[in-house]
From Swiss-Prot:
PANTHER family: METHYLTHIORIBULOSE-1-PHOSPHATE DEHYDRATASE. One of its GO terms (molecular function) is methylthioribulose 1-phosphate dehydratase activity. InterPro entries: Aldolase_II/adducin_N, Aldolase_II/adducin_N_sf, MethylthioRu-1-P_deHdtase_MtnB. The keyword Ribonucleoprotein does not apply. Pathway: Amino-acid biosynthesis; L-methionine biosynthesis via salvage pathway; L-methionine from S-methyl-5-thio-alpha-D-ribose 1-phosphate: step 2/6. It is an enzyme of class 4 (lyase). It comes from Azotobacter vinelandii (strain DJ / ATCC BAA-1303). Its EC number is 4.2.1.109. Signal peptide: none annotated. This is Methylthioribulose-1-phosphate dehydratase. It comes from the Bacteria.
């Protein structure tokens, strides 16, 4: 049985409190969503503190990113959420966070991707059953034109159907899952790996 709107709204609110508490979604940054139906998603409204979300801070949109609730404005980055739902129908939740580690690492790396290899925690990602693999995380340059940014992201996703998340340079992380708990697990796994990568680089003098 699919979750109700009330249940999905509660999941988004609780995700905000958890992610804010970990320091991964400071102030009004970040945005979260959940699939409501094949053609609709629930998203956080624009400009709200993610540690203080209430039921009125979530709205329904169509898959083109248009608000279905007059008077409520979705996040400017709504298209980056809805394109993930149209990319894979099994995706049920999308989380976009603004942690220090994701922001710094995405600025530090000058190439267009970050590769993790041989970390045991890679098995926390959906579809990964061994540490003996590589996870390629693309890094897209930030762009205030979200439609243009989305048009760069989608071809990469289509060419890499095993992608589990991506970074926007100097901005943050996007990751997803079949349900909200799956997406939260992937955020936590990414943050562990980002922390490891930054510490390794510091120790190696890079």
């Amino acid at each position: 049985m699919s979750p109700t709107r009330a249940q999905l709204t509660r999941q988004i609110i609780e995700a905000g409190r958890f992610l804010y508490g970990r320091g991964w979604s400071p102030a009004t940054s970040s945005n979260y969503s959940a699939r409501l139906s094949p053609g609709e998603a629930l998203l956080t409204v624009s400009g709200k503190h993610k540690g203080q979300l209430g039921e009125d801070d979530v709205l329904a949109t169509d898959m083109a990113g248009n608000s279905l609730e007059p008077g409520k404005k979705p996040s400017a980055e709504t298209l980056l959420h809805t394109q993930l739902y149209t990319w894979k129908t099994e995706i049920g939740a999308v989380l976009h966070t603004h942690s220090v580690n994701a922001t710094v690492l995405s600025r530090l790396i000058l190439s267009d991707s970050l590769v993790f290899a041989d970390y045991e925690l890679q098995k926390a990602f959906a579809g990964i059953g061994t540490h003996e693999c590589q996870i390629c995380v693309p890094i897209f340059d930030n762009d205030q034109d979200i439609a243009r940014l989305a048009s760069r992201v989608r071809p990469w996703l289509d060419e890499h159907p095993d992608c589990v998340g991506y970074l926007i340079r100097g901005h943050g992380l996007y990751t997803w899952g079949a349900a909200m708990n799956d997406a939260l697990r992937q955020v936590e796994a990414f943050e562990f790996l980002f922390d490891c990568e930054l510490k390794m680089r510091a120790l190696q003098g890079r």
